[in-house]
Every structure is written in structure tokens, then in C-alpha cells.
């Protein structure tokens, strides 16, 4: 955590504002609850931008591992409120909070080793992992990955990438055994 503190200090010295946010866990709530929570936090920041001295036109999200997944999802889904895949529609924005006149769009993403294509997590893995990783993905979507292909695609940030996707800065260690490096290579 020391490197995070140092980076945060440098950002603060250069007039950046840092906000940490909580979201519902996949142990208690399935997708898209987590996305709705983060989008609500972004809307709150935009709705209170004057009081908080925030530029609502330059909001960057950052996350590590599962937080990287959320950050990547936030960037990839920016500009989209609903999405339909194979007849299943998903509300990407949600309706939490008091600032529904704002949107949850972000303008850049810093993704630290976040999974971006949950369907391909095991296909490009050099190391065989215990079942717990499958279980984490299954918790997120509320069922087995193999039996929920459409929902697995809907929870994967790569599904939403297009020419309007904001810029990404991606970090990933080549020896990561939890999230295979191919997940970041997919974004590159």
C-alpha cells in the first residue's frame, strides 16, 4: 500500500481529487448491483461538482483486480444506459441516488489487472487455478458461467467496447496467477 500512498500524494499535490467508493459485494448481490453503485457514486460527484470543486467533465476511475473489472466496465459502458444481447436487456445506469439528472459516464480508466472477458478467463491461463475463481465469477452472475453465456458476456467489459470508449491505462503483472495477463492483452 505504500506505493498507493505515494501516488495519491503526487496526485493531490497536482490538484487532483481522490474519492474512494464502496459497492455491494457479489457475495450479497449479483450483477449489475455493483455497477449501479459505482454509477450512482459518479452521478453524486457530478451532481455536487461545484461544492466539491470537481470537474464533472474529467472523471477517471481506477481499480485493482475485481475493482479493475468495475473500472473497466465503467469505461466500456460509458455513453450507454441500456444494452441488449441475445434478447436479454440490461440497465447499465441504474436508478440509485438523488442525482438521476446526471450520468455515470467516466472519461478515462486506470485498470490494474482487472478481468475483462469472464468467458475467456480459463482459456488463456498458464496456471491451473482452484475452483474458487470460477466460484467468484459465478457469484457475480448468480449461476455457473458455462450455463449463463449471455449473462457472462453482459458482465464482461469487452462486450461494450466501441470507438467511443474512453482511454485506458492498463497495468498487469506477467506472473499474475489470479487474473491471467491475457485479460489485459484483450484490452490492448
Q: What positions do the PLM features span?
A:
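Alpha/beta-hydrolase superfamily serine-hydrolase fold, recognizing
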Residues: 1-188
